[in-house]
Structure formats: structure tokens, C-alpha cells
Amino acid sequence: FPDGTFDVIVSRNLTWTLPDAARAYKEWIRVLKPGGVLINADANYGADDFSDTADLPANHAHFKLGDDMMQECEEIKRQLPISSYVRPAWDLETLGKLGISRFSIDLGISSRVYTKKDEFYNPTPMFLICGEKNKK
């Protein structure tokens, strides 16, 4: 996409999976119009052990994957640089350096997304970052 194409960019539960999250943020900001808004809902999933399902309901989303698959997911996750970052502090610092300002952050979004412990429940606390691209 050309520079400054979009008014809003929204991402949910994606950033933590990217091999180069800073590069993705840079690209998102490039295609965002000056004054445009970036909304990112994510979590510090890298800090959690996916193979530990003790706190999850019996019918959680990953129940059918099995222990081997969950261990493989854990090994892949450990290879992602973002898994070692302190988030969302890293996100805010990175976005600030790339030209995002006027931040708001919501650390309580999980309680509104996961209102009950059902098959979609995830105990990792989500965060929501909203920021505006500098108007230049």
C-alpha cells in the first residue's frame, strides 16, 4: 500500500506471533495517515508456558491439540524475539520511536473480552494500545 493510505489500523492477538514485530509496527505506521490511529489488542503471551494448562477449563480452545503440539508451539514461541520483551512497555517504547504519540493503554481489557471461563478463555492478561500517528 502507498504511504498514508489508512485512517485506522486494528490488530488483535497478532503482534506476539510476528518474527519482527518492530518491522511490522514500522510498516503499519508507514501506511497510516498522519493523525491516523493504531489500535493493537495483544498480550504478553511470550511470558506464559503454553504447555501448562492447569488454570484453563477442561474445554479450553487448545484442548484438542494435545501435549506434543502444545510443546511444539512453546518451542516456536521461545524463538520469537518478542517473547523475551516486557510488554506492553516494549510496544509503547517502539511505537513512540516510530512516530506514534498520544497513547492510551487499557490493561483491563481481558475482563471485558473474557467474561467467563469458556472454551475461548485465556488467562494471559490482554492489553489494548491506542496511539495516534504524528501529524507532521
Task: Please tell me what each predicted stretch does.
Residues 82-99, 105-106:
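Short alpha-helix
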Residues 37-69:
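Conserved class I S-adenosyl-L-methionine
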Residues 1-3:
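Short conserved loop adjoining the S-adenosyl-L-methionine
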Residues 10:
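A conserved beta-strand element that flanks and buttresses the S-adenosyl-L-methionine
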Residues 13-14:
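Short catalytic micro-motifs in class I SAM-dependent methyltransferases
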Residues 22-37:
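A short glycine-rich, Lys/Arg-flanked "PGG" loop and its adjoining helix->strand segment in the class I
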Residues 98-100, 115-136:
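Core SAM-dependent methyltransferase catalytic element
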